[in-house]
Regions:
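A short, conserved alpha-helix in the catalytic core of glycosyltransferases
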Residues: 166, 175-196, 200, 226, ...
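Short, acidic, metal-binding catalytic loop of nucleotide-sugar glycosyltransferases
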Residues: 66-72, 113-116, 279-289
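Glycine-rich, basic loop-to-helix element that forms the pyrophosphate-binding segment
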Residues: 80-88, 323-340
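Acidic donor-binding segment of Leloir-type glycosyltransferases
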Residues: 282-325
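A recurrent flexible, glycine/aromatic-enriched loop bordering the glycosyltransferase active site
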Residues: 136-166, 330-331, 338, 394-436
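C-terminal, non-catalytic tails of nucleotide-sugar-dependent glycosyltransferases
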Residues: 2-72, 218-258, 383-384, 395-422, ...
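Short aromatic/hydrophobic "clamp" motif used to bind/position activated sugar donors
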Residues: 93, 345
Length: 548
């Protein structure tokens, strides 16, 4: 450990003191000696180790098999996990989920991050699983902090670093405290300052493989923590578990006063897809006043023109805008958005069809959250396979759909195909946002991104303005993708597409190469989303230091 400090040009005194809290069920202590080895390797730097356990009267030294050369007795203290004493002046605590083994360099990685960012309140890392034979399998590469994914899945596992003053706020646990409720309490204590939660994109701990095989017990425990919190802290909210996986769907309370929603549908002929799209919207039941704006881009088919005329005559909620300019998806949406005063805009492709009856209310409840800039839905191909559950930056060069083609009942890595989470970008095939934000950002970029990537660009500008983008899979639509538009195969379209790709790379290159919602250990090659990257885009501090 001293060698790495020297390589980094740091003195040992530059690093904080850590307090390691090992939460262990001693009925199965086979993994604990490895943690003793980790502690022993750091004993010269970190002078006090506190082993917190849940078996009164049991010897932590015996359970950990700490020999005389491991940690000196004066450096080891045992406590009950329900101990209500504060952190006694120490700066940080490492919490481990049951039967977790620390990576040899985990403490160093935590210390290096805290040295750079001392105000960080909570830090987590990636993890893998260990079989009974000691084989490491099934690595889990996490995104940077995603509060909505955490509420849905409680994805923080393994080794969690907590600043001592945050621990003191939550000091003391009930006798039946679970790791899930403890972490949930610490996360909610951070509250409205999510920037104080950091992620180290490297494997820092090893969990027993039964957590991979049987995840339901921890998901049930997380659900109980969420439900308890909502009952006391967020009146009007509701949570349920989505079967068969057990992830949590949080339904937030409705706005006190309904906000009008303008659903904007660009179209050019394509009557066979436009009719079911509009019919589903018209039949939607919502507490919000509804306006439907169809912007017709030079339709020529008489049946389409007759249908639009009938719509306008039959339904006072429908507005038809004619635009005969060359196809410009961004410009069409901007023109329609400028024609309404509705507080909420829902951009909707004409080749989509709503499945979820309460889709407008669900999207609106999320779009009205102060921190949310835009909300998207889960989109399915007509054959039932997944088309969109969020966009991955950099995939295939600019951005792509990582879950495209996945079976509808496949939850995907970290349940992100079925759980609410914050991808870095969303498709505008179904996208709801506040008109005030849309107007402040000057809408879609109709000059540089007339057709492709204008939705990704808008999402990146939302992030730059301090807003998050949210995928709400509880809302589902069928998407018959680009039926009325066609493809990019002719030379002019190919040239236009290449120009838009170049604009995105020139404007957002650094962001496209570092998607915070997608772990840098994972591939960005087209068709290889969520597989291990052949060329890693990140490296642990200790590896960089060892080459110096």
């Amino acid at each position: 450990m001293h060698r790495f400090f020297r390589i980094l040009g740091l003195a040992i005194t530059d690093f904080p003191t850590f307090w390691q809290r090992l939460r262990a069920r001693f009925s199965s202590p086979r993994a604990l000696p490895a943690n003793a080895d980790t502690a022993a390797s750091s004993a010269a730097v970190y002078q006090q180790w506190i082993i917190a356990h849940d078996r009164p009267g049991y010897s932590a030294r015996v359970a950990l098999d700490l020999g005389p050369l491991a940690i000196p007795a004066r450096q080891l203290t045992t406590r009950s996990v329900t101990d209500r004493r504060p952190s006694d002046g120490d700066t940080h605590i490492i919490l481990l989920s049951n039967h977790t083994v620390l990576h040899d360099m985990a403490v160093f990685e935590f210390a290096a991050l805290i040295q750079r960012c001392p105000s960080i309140a909570l830090v987590y890392g990636d993890y893998d699983h260990v079989t009974g034979m000691g084989e490491r399998i099934n690595p889990v590469f996490l995104p940077d902090w995603d509060p909505d994914l955490f509420w849905s899945t409680g994805y923080l596992r393994g080794a969690i670093l907590v600043r001592a003053d945050l621990w003191d706020q939550r000091c003391g646990m009930a006798e039946d405290t679970t790791f899930e409720s403890l972490i949930f309490g610490l996360v909610t204590a951070v509250g409205d300052t999510p920037e104080q939660i950091a992620h180290i994109p490297h494997i820092l701990s090893h969990l027993p493989d039964r957590e991979w095989i049987e995840p339901r017990p921890r998901l049930d425990a997380h659900f109980q923590a969420v439900r308890t919190y909502l009952q006391t802290s967020l009146p009007g909210a509701d949570a349920r578990q989505i079967e068969p996986h057990g992830i949590v769907d949080v339904r937030r309370p409705s706005a006190p006063a309904p906000a009008a929603i303008a659903v904007i549908i660009p179209t050019r002929d394509g009557l066979e897809v436009l009719m079911p799209c509009v019919q589903a919207v018209r039949q939607s039941v919502s507490m919000h006043p509804l306006e439907i704006i169809i912007i017709d881009n030079a339709s020529e088919n008489q049946a389409t023109l007759d249908y639009l005329a009938e719509l306008k005559a039959d339904d006072p909620r429908v507005t038809i805008i004619r635009d005969d300019a060359p196809f410009n998806f961004a410009g069409l949406n901007n023109r329609a958005a400028a024609a309404t005063t509705a507080p909420l805009l829902c951009f909707l492709n004409n080749d989509t069809e709503v499945i979820s009856a309460d889709w407008l209310d669900r999207l609106a409840a999320e779009a009205l959250r102060p921190e949310i800039g835009a909300v998207g839905a889960r989109l399915l191909y007509p054959d039932g396979r997944v088309q969109h559950t969020g966009v991955i930056l950099g995939l295939g060069g600019v951005a792509g759909h990582g879950d495209a083609g996945r079976p509808a009942d496949d939850p995907g890595p970290l349940y992100r195909a079925v759980a609410s989470h914050r991808p870095s970008a969303l498709t505008a095939a179904c996208l709801m946002m506040r008109s005030s934000i849309f107007n402040r950002l000057n809408g879609f970029d109709a000059t540089n991104l007339a057709i492709d990537f204008n939705d990704v660009d808008l999402c990146l500008r939302l992030h730059a303005a301090g807003y998050a983008t949210l995928l709400l899979p509880a809302v589902e639509l069928v998407h018959k993708e680009s039926i009325s538009r066609g493809d990019n195969r002719d030379p002019a379209e190919s040239a236009r597409f290449a120009k838009e790709v170049a604009y995105m790379r020139d404007t957002w290159g650094a962001d496209l190469d570092h998607d915070p919602a997608y772990n840098p250990n994972l591939s960005i090659a087209l068709g290889e989303a969520y597989s291990l990257a052949e060329s890693l885009r990140t490296e642990p501090v200790w590896k960089r230091a060892s080459r110096s």
